[in-house]
């Protein structure tokens, strides 16, 4: 049960930070480009890599802190960092085809799912 509390606490903080960072960045640059989301995703990748590099590979990250920081906080802040981390692991293990499938598949199918979901939603309400 405690593991769910770590994830929930991290998730609450991560979603709040995502909202704040994205909103402030978008207002700061006042552009139609989604710079807020772009910034959150890049910050998330940097932070995920930093935490993993520092703690998991060198200093040891207790399982509870992994749940709090990586699963909870980062999971709510951005899943893009997890997507990139998993792609990096595929590259490290020499699985180039799987890397291309993961990156290409998630990008293309994700876009198609958004378009399909929007169309389905509009169809349902019309």
Curated annotation (Swiss-Prot):
It catalyses: fluoride(in) = fluoride(out). The chain crosses the membrane at residues 4-24, 35-55, 67-87, 100-120. Na(+) binds at residues 75, 78. GO terms for cellular component: plasma membrane. Pfam families: CRCB. It is a multi-pass membrane protein. Na(+) is not transported, but it plays an essential structural role and its presence is essential for fluoride channel function. It is found in: Cell inner membrane. Keywords: Cell inner membrane, Cell membrane, Ion channel, Ion transport, Membrane, Metal-binding, Sodium, Transmembrane, Transmembrane helix, Transport. Its main location: membrane. GO terms for biological process: cellular detoxification of fluoride. Belongs to the fluoride channel Fluc/FEX (TC 1.A.43) family. HAMAP family: FluC. Fluoride-specific ion channel. Important for reducing fluoride concentration in the cell, thus reducing its toxicity. This is Fluoride-specific ion channel FluC. It comes from Maridesulfovibrio salexigens (strain ATCC 14822 / DSM 2638 / NCIMB 8403 / VKM B-1763).
């Amino acid at each position: 049960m405690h593991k769910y509390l770590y994830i929930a606490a991290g998730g609450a903080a991560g979603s709040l930070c995502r909202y704040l960072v994205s909103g402030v960045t978008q207002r700061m640059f006042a552009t139609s480009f989604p710079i807020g989301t772009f910034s959150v995703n890049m910050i998330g990748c940097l932070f995920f890599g930093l935490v993993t590099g520092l703690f998991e590979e060198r200093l040891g990250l207790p399982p509870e802190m992994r749940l709090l920081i990586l699963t909870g906080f980062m999971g709510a802040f951005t899943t893009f960092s997890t997507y990139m981390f998993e792609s990096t692991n595929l590259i490290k293990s020499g699985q180039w085809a799987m890397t291309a499938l993961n990156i290409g598949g998630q990008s293309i199918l994700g876009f198609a799912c958004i378009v399909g979901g929007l169309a389905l939603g509009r169809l349902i309400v019309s």
